[in-house]
Amino acid sequence: MRVIERFYFSTVGHIKAIFLKKTLDKSIKIEGFALKMMTFFKEAFQVNRKSYPERVRSALFHAIKKTAANLDACVKVPGKDFSRKRKLPLQTMLLMLIGMGGGSLSKELYDWFGYTPSTATASAFVQQRNKIRSKAVEMIFNDFVSSAMPTMTFRGYRLFAVDGSDLRLPSDPTNDFSLIRNAEGQKQYNLAHLNAMFDLMSKAYVDVTMQGKKGMNEHKALISMIDRSNIPGKVIVLMDRGYESFNNIAHLQEKKWNFIIRAKESYGMISNLQLPNSEEFDVDTTLTLTRRQTKETLALLSAYPERYRWIQPHTTFDYIAPKDPKMYDLRFRVVRFRISGGCYETVYTNLDSETFPIGKIKELYRLRWGIETSFRELKYTIGLSCLHGKKTDFLLQEVLKMLYTQTVLAFARKTTAGVWTFFWTYLM
């Protein structure tokens, strides 16, 4: 945060110096220059001393204070953990977990306490940290994002991408959550899978779920992020073909969210659909799902395979119970378009065809690549590929801390870009 503040105030100083020189060189009336400067800072920075770093810091402190007040939801043993007055109360611990740098724990503690004799020990910090549920940091992250993230839209829609990425963890043979056991004689290792929902317009993460690699299920992770979201307004979610499923589309449909999902080309939902034999097309489709195997449904399945689909008992579909006789309709478009290299891509979407014709669908789906770029930055620039904790809760705390860092940087870029755009177009 101090780095952002220094950047902000140094930037303001440079702007003043540049314009002072320009004013003197061109003999511009000082009154006119002062008026422009006042207008610039009022519009670009909202000069009521509520600068960008201050707004971010205020949002973060509010989120931490709000979370710490809900003590029972934050600790592993309610009524016992953090019940006594200590050097490291819950609010201080939450601040430190998010604000500490990459130095050794002892150095970070000395920096935090100002090298005073009352500095808490590393052992005390670890003991206190072990009492905190990872949900506490998750609550802070969600509250911070919802209050500080600028709402940026594409034609009035929030634009999200969902994807997953593997994380190599410090070796820990006792951690069943992430341990991967290879064939006898080969070295074991620890691997987790990060599932994320990424705002493509603000370049910030809005939700994450971490799973052990051996038990990962991207479909469950997606559904949990959809169902628990309280984001208002119109939303478009972009996903790769790994997320194609009846259940995922049904959850998006029930949420009244729009989607663009890349289709599997030779199998999956696209099989048995009646589609044009052309290079590009846009077809409205309705699939009716059932778990019944009565004479009536079997006749429908046989006569209209492009419309009716039978869901097997072991297949997950949350809107028809195993013996429920009802049917469920999925409505979407099947859109095929040309991409680079003479190749073609097919996607499913429930966006309106008049507002979003083939060209717009192609443009939107191409934006999905933003989450891949963000994963690379998160791992290799911010340091997500170099996690230190071994316990599952500690790991998730570190992941959320780095997501917070990435989110702050994303907000800073957006704010700075807007400032400089205004700077060059309005003042120069």
Predicted regions and their residues:
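Single, function-defining residue in the core of a domain
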Residues: 2-103, 108-111, 116-120, 125-132, ...
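Short Lys/Arg-enriched helix C-cap and helix-to-coil transition segments
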Residues: 136-151
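Conserved beta-strand elements of the Class I
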Residues: 158-160
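Short, positively charged patches
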Residues: 179-180
